[in-house]
Amino acid sequence: MKLKPGCFARSLLTVAIGATVASWSQAQENASGAQGLEEIIVTAERRETSLQDTPISVLAFGGADLEKFGIDDLGDIQHSVPNLYMRQFPNSQASLRTYMRGVGNNDVGMSTDPSVGVYIDGVYVARSIGLGSEVASLERIEVLRGPQGSLYGRNTIGGAINMVTAKPTGEFGFKGGLSAGDSSYGRGRVELDTPRVGGLAAKVSMLKSKKDGWVTNQGSGPNFGDNDSFASRVALNWQPTDDVNVDYAYDMTDADSGTIYYQTLEAPLFGFSQVPYQSDRLDDVRPSTPVQESNVKIKGHALTVAWDISENTQIKSITGYRELDQSIYQDYSANRVTTRLYANAPFDNQQDQFSQELQVLGKFLDGAVDYVVGAYYFKEKGDEDSVDYITLPLGFLPPYPPIYDQLLEIELPHRVSSAENEASAFYGHFVWTPAAMQQLHLTLGLRYSKDDRAVKSSSSSQGFEYFTSDVDDSWDNHSIDVTAAYDITDDVNVYAKFTQGYKTGGFNIRATSDYAASLPLSEETVETIEVGIKAQFLDDRVRLNAAVFSSDYEDIQLSFAVLNDPTNVALYNAGAAKIKGAEIDLTTLITDSLKLTLGYGFLDTSVDDVDNPQTPEIEQNPAVLPGAPDNSFTADLDYTFPSFGLGELMLNVNYSKVDEAEFVSFVQRGFNIPGYDLWNARLSLGELSMGHGTASIALWGKNLGDEEYLLDGIESFPWSPLVAPFGEGRTWGVDFNYEY
């Protein structure tokens, strides 16, 4: 699927580059007064530090970046971060499967954990359900690539993502925005800040978004890909004294969505000759039965209390409680014509979690050592209820003639399960800068983790119970990380680090036998060596950050759907895996008006020493790591036009390219997700005086080349070797924002 950029995309890029000629000349004349790149502050090490002083391969996106790239939810950032790969879960737009540096999870079940940790204001979010939904008042996203060791611990074996929301300003203020676009897209948001009274300030945010799906449903029910969501957030900041700061936030999301359309792409198998297929993207289909909406509701509370007990010591408490309730409908069999083939997979689950973290941050040895020590506790519980139905005419199956129209109704196993997970940890992170060598920074991190998991599950069909299972197990881990960083100059530093990572063990909640459901997974571990450089030069007009790494995984956890039976998901410790790779992030301020940002990621993955799995057919197929494209590339161009007396006119053009990637751990029928290219652009006019505030208006377009690309794939259905969803085609819209 090769990109054919539209004239609009090529024209925008040509205008942006061509317009630099006069600006470049002007910049040379005014070099002495030229501006540099802005400093980026991150909290990757649990304290505020400059991006350039943080020995981690990290990218940060502030509020302006989120608006510029049209990032409405976490899933949108993957096209701006090399070596980050995200896929929607097959039966939910709101659920994300996240892979970083080639490591991720194909399942979102309660009996296993993700490989990439996601945090909202420091609170760990255990389930990826709902991460594809919009978050109100999002201020910054930080992407930390690679295992995060002592400071984050369990389940950050691939990396971590920090989502930071806006805090109350303590002054009266208002922000609002309206958006409209094709496919009946509409979005509105408001954000209100109150003045600080008695040490208390508040921020209230609300967001409403609605859009028709990109595959029209010619039958009954919503379009495929419909979305209708509401999110709100109330944030309070209380400063009773100069030494105490209290932040509390309540957030909620309520999102309705149409099912993702899984298109039959290859010729049917096993006599399903009447099932139509098409390799090009379909724009409309006619399901055999009415399509129903899916819904996810999320609520969360977060309380952070920071107390400066002395000039060099702070105690911080982070308390979080979150709950979710999800009801999913999925139709895997809709086609352009009604075939009476019907495959439906309803799925319901609930989850709630509580976490408490206590940190002590400070300095000692006359400021030579910065430290963070802490204790962490986490508990979650939840349940799932799922069943799959297939209805088809017997004429689809030999030896029945094609005209034989009697329906065969099949109820596949009905699974009911519940899980309780508990985790605790103690950790310390110390950074020593010797007084005799201020350019050297040595880091030592230590962490002890313990996990307990209990899972109950049962499987039945049409009144017959196949099995019930009631199991529990526990795991623990000691890990270290060591870093040596050296400042070659004030603007150039290099680092080398060794990090151990840990992902807790679990059980297979999708198992189809008591034996498979009762067999525990061992914990997954990794050892990573990384070498990097962070540099700014040419009067801070060029920023270059790069890293190379090598990771060795033991007992890596892989899952896959058994051939011809999508309800049978095998999960086990496959053995050892090795990942080598690199990341390069380059930002250059070519002129005061033109900024170019380039990013590149490379991965070389292999799965070695594969243990003998339970399913013999897998022995004949190579094991691979899904979500690990060899190459990923991003380019972003920002141009500010010369002033013409009315606001500030800016153009952004961004491009992303990703190589093909596997979507299953074991290649069974030879399919994968082909590589693709995407072009986006945004033309905005800002700094417009309006009343007592300022306004901006913007015209934007996404996937300007109307690229046909796949998001995922399933090759385990008996009626087709491959069904897969396409990504959204070309879209456009207009934004209006106002603040005072």
Language-model features: where?
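N-terminal Sec signal peptide and the immediately downstream disordered periplasmic leader
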Residues: 1-81, 242-246, 588, 685-687
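Conserved C-terminal beta-signal and adjacent last beta-strands/turns
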Residues: 6-9, 347-365, 370-374, 496, ...
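Outer-membrane beta-barrel domain signature, strongest for Gram-negative TonB-dependent receptors
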Residues: 221, 227-371, 378-380, 543-544
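Surface-exposed extracellular loop regions of Gram-negative outer-membrane beta-barrel proteins
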Residues: 256-268, 379-383, 452-457, 486-530, ...
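Acidic, small-polar-rich N-terminal luminal/periplasmic segments of exported/outer-membrane proteins
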Residues: 35-171, 531
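Outer-membrane beta-barrel translocator/receptor signature
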Residues: 113-115, 127, 134-145, 149-232, ...
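Membrane-embedded beta-barrel scaffold of Gram-negative outer-membrane proteins
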Residues: 302-308, 314-332, 487, 493-503, ...
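Gram-negative outer-membrane beta-barrel transporters
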Residues: 371-374, 436, 442, 550-552, ...
